[in-house]
Amino acid sequence: MLQDIMNTKKIKLHDCHFGSPLCDPSPAPHLLSSAAAAGLSFHPGLVSSAAQHQQHGAGGWLHEEYYAPRSSPPSSLLAQTCVGSNATAFYAAENLPQFDFPALGTAAAAAAKAPFRSSESELYRPVDPLLLRADHSVRTYYVRPQKRDSGERTPLPPPSQQQHQDRIHGLFAGAPTTRLLSGEPKIHLFPPQVAAKPILPAMDAPSLQNQMENQLTRNCIGAATPVTPTGNLAGSGAPSKTRIRWTQDLHERFVDCVNQLGGADKATPKGILKLMNSDGLTIYHIKSHLQKYRIAKYMPASSEGKQLEKRATGNDMQNLDPKTGMQITEALRVQLDVQRRLHEQLEIQRNLQLRIEEQGKRLQKMFEDQLKASRSVMEPQELDDVVAFAAGDGDDDAFDDVDVQLLAVAGSGYDDAGFQSKIS
């Protein structure tokens, strides 16, 4: 039973929860007496803590602002959170009149039907810092039951304080974006006695809160700035380039304007734009189209043919299988070898032809020199031959006469010798 009572007084508080109620661990005196009458017993440490609280007073405890619930949660939900006890025992031990427990009396049931309002003085509850754990993830606090009259209607907090409370609730109610973008400062409300004392470790989470707020601010700012198609921010004022399609009619007008201005070399984008006078065209469109027009006009046809041939050859090579490709490579290698040998033979023939020509020139020169030498030798000999021939004509006549006479003498002498010829 003691374990059940202790379990009902434990509340787990996480660092990220800012507005959880923190209460004084000292139980109310009338609860101690009522619990003793009912047969319940409290832990000695809890009773000593209550006595210490009565001696020192409530001014020495740290406080944290919280908001009392206006509507009671379902009894089944709270009963499930209390380990080892039912809902009736939990409500009776804590003296919470906003929940129904008719088994303990009709006065508490009547108080549960009345609307619950927390006064300004009840917004702060003392907490014993010595009972806080060193662990920053989960902390356990001992809650003191609240003492109030069943039929008393407490006044609502002042409007200004209610506005501050609603504003702080808005910080953690899922709408931090509007507050951060509007530039509203962060507000933390604490009672005056908290300012002079060290803050609880559970409340020392503004650093985590600031990180979350900064991240939300960056996300909101990044989502609120649209980006243009050119990559510039919408508020930068940079002109966005629109794309147009150059139809045949538009291109013909462009060519006419270029010809009027003296050709593609002399035409300027500004002059073409002025002559065309077409809606939607800008100087950037004219510059780009004029550059393409110049490139297409002055590109050599041979280079285009070579490019087309190379592309066709590349496509054909891609369509061939590896075996055929190897055969073609081998044939090309053989052809290169033949061409190399032909080139070597042509070079040898050329060198031989040059040598033959040089030798012919030398022979021609030798013949000319020989003719000159022979002419110089033959001229005096010819003169001698002419003189000798002229002198030899007279001698021949004398020799002829002598020969005739000798023949005559010989003939007569033969006849006289008695050798007569026999003629039949």
Swiss-Prot record:
Tell me which family the UniProt entry assigns to this protein.
Belongs to the MYB-CC family.
Q: What is this protein called?
A: Myb family transcription factor RLI1
Which Gene3D superfamilies does this chain map to? Homeodomain-like
Check the record and name the PROSITE patterns matching this protein. HTH_MYB
Source species: Oryza sativa subsp. indica (Rice)
Lineage runs:
Eukaryota, Viridiplantae, Streptophyta, Embryophyta, Tracheophyta
Per the annotation, the residue ranges of the short sequence motif LHEQLE are 342-347
State the protein's purpose: Transcription factor binding to specific DNA sequences of target genes promoters, such as the motif R1BS 5'-NAKATNCN-3' and the motif P1BS 5'-GNATATNC-3' to trigger their expression. Nitrate-induced component involved in modulating phosphate (Pi) response and homeostasis together with PHR2; activates directly the expression of Pi starvation-induced (PSI) genes upon nitrate disponibility, thus triggering the nitrate-induced phosphate response (NIPR) promoting Pi uptake activity.
| Cellular localization per UniProt | Nucleus
Subunit record text: Homodimer. Interacts with PHR2 in the nucleus. Interacts with SPX1 and SPX2 in the nucleus; these interactions prevent binding to the promoters of target genes, thus regulating negatively leaf inclination in response to phosphate (Pi) starvation.
Q: Which InterPro entries match?
A: Homeodomain-like_sf (IPR009057), Myb_CC_LHEQLE (IPR025756), Myb_dom (IPR017930), Myb_dom_plants (IPR006447), PHR1-like (IPR046955), SANT/Myb (IPR001005)
* Sorted UniProt keywords: Activator, Brassinosteroid biosynthesis, Brassinosteroid signaling pathway, Coiled coil, DNA-binding, Lipid biosynthesis, Lipid metabolism, Nucleus, Steroid biosynthesis, Transcription, Transcription regulation
